[in-house]
Amino acid sequence: MNILVAGATGKTGRRLMQALQDHGHTPIALVRESSDTSVLPEGAQTRQGDLTDLQEGACDGCDAVVFAAGSGADTGQDMTDKVDRKGAMRLIDLAAKSGASRFVMLSSVGADKPEKGGEMEHYLQAKQDADEHLKASGLTYAILRPVSLTDEDGTRQMLFGDDVDETAEAARGDVAAVLADAVSSDAWANKTMLMQSA
């Protein structure tokens, strides 16, 4: 499958690109002109695009799309709106228009109750808005809501759903493995799931 990955050069995205290759897929990194593509796996395909200003055709020729991007902890609410809300929603719309069969969203624990997020409320509201837009899009979707991320590769021992401790941690390597699986696994079709590393 040809799979477009938004956020491919990030800490989770680069692991996801490798995991998709390992699954036999052809991942295509959606990158800005300024992106450091040296972090991508050898031979990775790229497609130029900016989540703050996505053009028509961004998802053309892709069987599935994964949103693993984020505006980052150091950006303000304006960039959160541009990337995590509007950018994600625009990518969802373009995926649906292009005929993609599935959209996988990297969301966050707490996106189901942003009002309880304290200083994270604005970010979590943006994630919730994008998640709800995806659910209403008509696309087959998978929404992963990991707990606090670490930069570990993980052990592929994970807990999901009601078994998750929301104060626990999730290794980025484990998150990438789940996202790669969710691209094609029927077990993930139209599911929203909490996740942690065990």
Task: Kindly give the residue locations of the regions a language model identified.
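Short, polar loop motifs at secondary-structure junctions
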Residues: 30-37, 146-148
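Conserved beta-strand positions in the Rossmann-like core of class I SAM-dependent methyltransferases
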Residues: 4, 28, 142
